[in-house]
Amino acid sequence: MLNDPHCLRCECDRHGGYIEYSIRHLHPDWDVLTQTYEIRSMTDDGRFIYHSDFQLFPLGSSIPADFSQYPRAAKAALWQAIFRVKRYYLATFEPDIVQHLIKQPFSVPQRFAFYCQHLSLPNYDISHDRYNIWYVLKAE
């Protein structure tokens, strides 16, 4: 389990799962971040392709929201939490291939640079295409 006092629940293993992480300490309007990993397909050589998705929930809501309107400093702390959770899953379970779908394709190059800066992992090659950022576990 993620060794962090803000981790509320960690139901994941090598086959996917989810993590619930409290973000209340980051902003009074925020409640929970959920990060899921789900196997969606397999490569011809038998490696699993995981889909990664996170959602942010405002305080008292069961409907995820867009937090883009919040101040840059608050979002910087939020991204640190998101990357902490992502780093935990990738480093602990070493999924073969992870797809991070970027919902605004025009921002993929900027988001790719951001991921390279904040989620650089020695066991993974990182690349991108028009809509996704890919983490591919290096062969041993």
Identify what each model region corresponds to:
Residues 1-140:
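Non-catalytic substrate-recognition and accessory regions of acyl/acetyltransferase enzymes
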